[in-house]
Swiss-Prot record:
It catalyses: XMP + L-glutamine + ATP + H2O = GMP + L-glutamate + AMP + diphosphate + 2 H(+). CDD domains: GATase1_GMP_Synthase (cd01742). Disulfide bonds: none annotated. Pathway: Purine metabolism; GMP biosynthesis; GMP from XMP (L-Gln route): step 1/1. GO terms for molecular function: ATP binding; GMP synthase activity. HAMAP family: GMP_synthase_A. The keyword Transcription does not apply. This is GMP synthase [glutamine-hydrolyzing] subunit A. Keywords: ATP-binding, Glutamine amidotransferase, GMP biosynthesis, Ligase, Nucleotide-binding, Purine biosynthesis.
Length: 184
């Protein structure tokens, strides 16, 4: 059975990420972001959202593990910042129901959502510049880089919250990540 850990970066929806994976039949565990990287035994990692970069614990070190990583909201931002991209204040801050345009139908994480999907966004900062090796896979009117992927390294990020009920195809994002982690 595929095992995916959800790293708690103190976000308000982290428990919903764990529940979404559990409901898909994934062997999942919610772990504290102070867990040493060498103690992680998993086929994949979800870096949860959270309030700010000052409370991300060992999350940057998890990017060095040789397993797929999905960053959600702050998780995507810390991935971009740690791997050489740039994060800054967004033009739109707060909560929003957003229509996201999928730019890469072949992307293993979100390509199946093409041509567009409705999502729930809740962020003040966003990725402004992609790290080397990443492609922008989704965009919207309120956020230029809504999703990014580096399929060579199995690193994926979404700025929105697929775990929230207001996101219309959120479960599909988790299904796709489960399949990536299982090698399907």
């Amino acid at each position: 059975m595929t095992r995916i850990v959800v790293v708690d970066n103190h976000g308000q929806f982290t428990h919903l990420e764990h529940r979404a994976l559990r409901d898909l039949g994934v062997d999942t565990e919610l772990i504290d972001n102070d867990t040493p990287p060498e103690e992680i035994d998993a086929d994949g990692i979800v870096l949860s959202g959270g309030p700010d970069m000052d409370r991300i614990g060992h999350s940057p070190a998890y990017l060095d593990l040789d397993i797929p990583v999905l960053g959600i909201c702050l998780g995507m931002q810390l991935m971009a910042a740690e791997l050489g991209g740039r994060v800054g204040a967004g033009d739109y801050g707060g909560y929003a129901d957003v229509t996201v345009s999928i730019e890469d139908e072949s992307d293993p994480l979100i390509g199946s959502l093409a041509p567009e999907t409705r999502v729930w966004a809740s962020h003040a900062d966003e990725v402004k510049e992609l790290p080397d090796g990443f492609e922008r896979t989704a965009t919207s009117e309120v956020c230029n880089i809504e999703a990014m992927s580096d399929t060579d390294r199995n690193r994926y990020g979404v700025q929105w919250h697929p775990e929230v009920a207001h996101t219309e195809a959120g479960e599909e994002v988790f299904e796709n990540f489960r399949d990536i982690c299982a090698g399907d």
